[in-house]
């Protein structure tokens, strides 16, 4: 469930404030499960809607969904396996290059295939998160020069998802209203 609060989408708010769920791990897992449900709903969009930019000079829904999958893959393969190993985290790919490559691929790929690949990768992420021991959720990561706990890192990724979900939802709402 998504709640709009002063224009900001907050699904972790729903779990904590409305349902009384305090565990940030449950909030993260809930977020990812809800995000999969949302992505599935995009399968019914007409192709022209899928490929139309959400705003002038912005990405299309295809490009937005398409760029999320390689980042999930990165977290599954280049972040989570290094928890508790003491090894340095691998460098992140160049964000602009990865985003542009994935956006191009999404523009030229089948809509259902893009969505299903995203869902498969997000499901891998969920399964990987479920395997993390309780004590590791507060472990400090050092991506680059900053330090951040795993839970804060994952909450940041969820906020990134929600930013894009909001863009897509608002674009669809405006178009449905004829704006």
Model-identified regions with their sequence ranges:
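Alpha-helix N-cap/loop-to-helix boundary motif
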Residues: 27-30, 56-57, 68, 72, ...
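Short, contiguous alpha-helical
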Residues: 2-16, 51-97, 139-179
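Acidic/His metal-coordination segments adjacent to aromatic residues that form catalytic metal sites
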Residues: 20-22, 99-113, 143-152
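Extreme N-terminal tail/first-helix region
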Residues: 2-33, 37
């Amino acid at each position: 469930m998504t709640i709009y609060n002063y224009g900001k989408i907050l699904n972790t708010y729903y779990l904590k404030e409305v349902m009384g769920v305090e565990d940030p791990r449950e909030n993260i897992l809930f977020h990812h499960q809800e995000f999969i449900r949302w992505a599935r709903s995009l399968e019914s969009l007409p192709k022209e809607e899928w490929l139309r930019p959400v705003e002038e000079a912005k990405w299309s829904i295809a490009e937005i969904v398409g760029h999320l999958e390689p980042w999930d893959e990165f977290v599954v393969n280049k972040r989570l396996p290094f928890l508790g190993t003491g090894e340095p985290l691998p460098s992140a790919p160049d964000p602009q290059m990865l985003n542009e490559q994935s956006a191009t691929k999404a523009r030229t790929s089948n809509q259902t295939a893009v969505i299903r690949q995203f869902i498969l990768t997000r499901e891998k992420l969920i399964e990987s998160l479920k395997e993390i021991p309780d004590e590791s959720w507060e472990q400090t990561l050092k991506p680059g020069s900053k330090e951040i706990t795993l839970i804060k890192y994952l909450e940041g990724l969820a906020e990134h998802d929600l930013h894009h979900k909001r863009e897509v939802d608002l674009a669809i709402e405006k178009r449905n209203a004829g704006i």
